Amino acid sequence: MRAHAKEMVFPIGAPNDGFAQYFSGRSFLAPISTSQVGIFNVTFEPGCRNNWHIHHAKSGGGQILVCVAGRGYYQEEGKDAVEMKPGDCINIPAEVKHWHGAAPDEWFSHLAIEVPGENGSNEWLEPVSDEEYGKLQ
């Protein structure tokens, strides 16, 4: 983890205990901004990923992910996973079922930016199966 921390300018943060039930593996959370727009640096240990989930909103909403260190993946339901490396940006519209997490053999950190929306909420769903995750390249 120390080598990974040296790759980025954002803090790794504290163990993400508040959301641990929605992750397979250990993750860490560092709030970067909590006013106007929520921005959090999320760090995943190798093999860690979050459950499938949906960011709901009546209008607007969604999430933006910006990889800041390591290597990871983002996947929308029904589509192939997309590899993320530092500098890659993923725009996730509201109502899209998806997951994101680290590559099996590398740490991964991304900024998670909450897109403001009307009546926004998150719905956490089932874990990403080992079979699904095992298909990653």
Regions found by a protein language model. Name each.
Residues 41, 45-47, 93-95:
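Conserved SET/PR-domain catalytic core that frames the SAM/AdoMet-binding pocket
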Residues 91, 105-124:
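A short hydrophobic beta-strand segment most commonly corresponding to one strand
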Residues 101-103:
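Asparagine-centered strand-capping/turn motif at beta-strand->loop junctions
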Residues 1-40, 51, 121-137:
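A short, N-terminal "cap"/entry segment at the start of jelly-roll beta-barrel domains
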Residues 42-45, 56-74, 113-116:
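Short, conserved beta-strand element in jelly-roll/cupin
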Residues 78-95:
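Short acidic-glycine-tyrosine-enriched beta hairpin
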